[in-house]
A protein has these predicted regions:
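Histidine-acidic metal/acid-base catalytic patches
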Residues: 2-46, 153-157, 167-306
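Acidic-and-aromatic substrate-binding clefts and catalytic sites of carbohydrate-active enzymes
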Residues: 35-38, 53-66, 76-85, 105-112, ...
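Catalytic domains of carbohydrate-active enzymes, especially glycoside hydrolases
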Residues: 36-63, 90-98
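Conserved, mostly hydrophobic/aromatic
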Residues: 48, 91, 131, 162, ...
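Structured helix-beta-strand junction loops
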Residues: 51-52, 127, 190
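Conserved beta-strand positions in the central sheet of alpha/beta enzyme cores
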Residues: 55-57, 73-74, 98-100, 160, ...
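Short, well-ordered beta-to-alpha junction loops that form the rim of enzyme active sites
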Residues: 61, 135-136, 254-258
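Active-site acidic/histidine proton-transfer and metal-coordination neighborhood
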Residues: 69-159
Length: 306
């Protein structure tokens, strides 16, 4: 259900909370030596629960999980205003708690962008389905300036924060980092869902190490991208907590994609065969713990400000 704050609400009187889901695309094309046991359907969902995940984000055409022991949400793409209600109706019928969407292609002018956002907000309201517009390249939110303008026209808009698209796609570290974070405040304040993916300034998906307090070995350049993502995530979580109502839920879903679409980096092994850089399931488990640490830090900051 949709809260009066525009976020997903579980109907409880609980304080606003974080729930860590797993985007199911994270399990696609994993390395043969992955720590994921390649379980299917019910047994797979049981394993995810045992590993500490609290839900899953299904892909567009997955079937409903009527008997699965785990909550689920969805994702899709809305290219035109005419598609908005059809997409929302499909996911409401499947029983999704909420959905994230790629909206448009980034070629829309101001008027077309406004009509698309308005249609998405209308569909969300009519279907009682929270819809979070994803911050993503090749969409209407592909750059910071345009996304902030959307918040001025539609202050009720809510986002799925996938910040790697800005961090890498707009090379956030090139220039004044702090001023860019301040500019992003209207985005942070409207994040109701988060995709977990850490990028470097030049690569969309890079690895972290098991010691979440240490600089990753792959952060070999001038900056520590892990520290930057901790700050991005904590700011978004702080924005959520400042406006969330009782029962509101912020979903964080690791979405570490395979090398098939050039997200996971591939390197030759000793036999010359290309091999993914990391076990993406093991990385998702680290993200789970990292997200919870960031949320705890955001909650601490809220209390300090009260």
């Amino acid at each position: 259900m949709i809260s009066s704050s525009g976020f997903f609400n579980d109907g409880s009187a609980d304080s606003p909370k974080l729930r860590v889901y797993l985007n199911m695309d994270n399990l696609g094309d994993l390395r043969t030596d992955s720590s994921w046991p390649h379980l299917e359907e019910f047994s797979g969902y049981q394993r995810l629960v045992a590993d500490g995940f609290e839900g899953v984000q299904l892909t567009t055409n997955d079937t409903a999980l009527a008997t699965a022991p785990i909550p689920y949400c969805g994702l899709d793409r809305i290219n035109t205003p005419a598609e908005a209600d059809k997409v929302a109706a499909k996911h409401a019928e499947r029983g999704d708690l909420c959905i994230t969407v790629h909206a448009g292609w980034g070629l829309e002018d101001e008027d077309a962008t406004s009509r698309l956002v308005e249609a998405i907000l209308t569909a969300s309201s009519q279907r009682r389905l929270p819809i979070f517009i994803e911050t993503h390249r090749a969409t209407i939110t592909q750059d910071l300036w345009r996304t902030v303008q959307i918040t001025k026209v539609f202050p009720e808009v809510r986002f799925n924060g996938d910040f790697g698209h800005y961090y890498c796609g707009q090379e956030l570290v090139y220039g004044d980092w702090k001023s860019k974070l301040e500019f992003m405040a209207p985005i942070f304040d409207r994040v109701g869902f988060m995709h977990g993916r850490i990028a470097s300034p030049g690569c969309m998906q890079v690895s972290i190490d098991s010691d979440l307090t240490a600089r990753p070995r792959q952060a070999h350049g001038e900056i520590n991208y892990l520290d930057h993502f901790k700050e991005l995530w904590t700011r978004a979580m702080l924005g959520f907590l400042r406006t969330a109502q009782p029962g509101d839920v912020l979903i964080f879903a690791p979405e570490l994609l395979s090398g098939r679409n050039y997200y996971a980096r591939m390197f030759p092994n000793s036999a010359g065969t290309l091999f993914e850089e990391t076990d993406r399931y093991a990385q998702a488990l680290l993200y789970k713990d990292l997200a919870r640490a960031c949320f705890a830090e955001a909650a601490k900051l809220v209390k300090e400000c009260d």
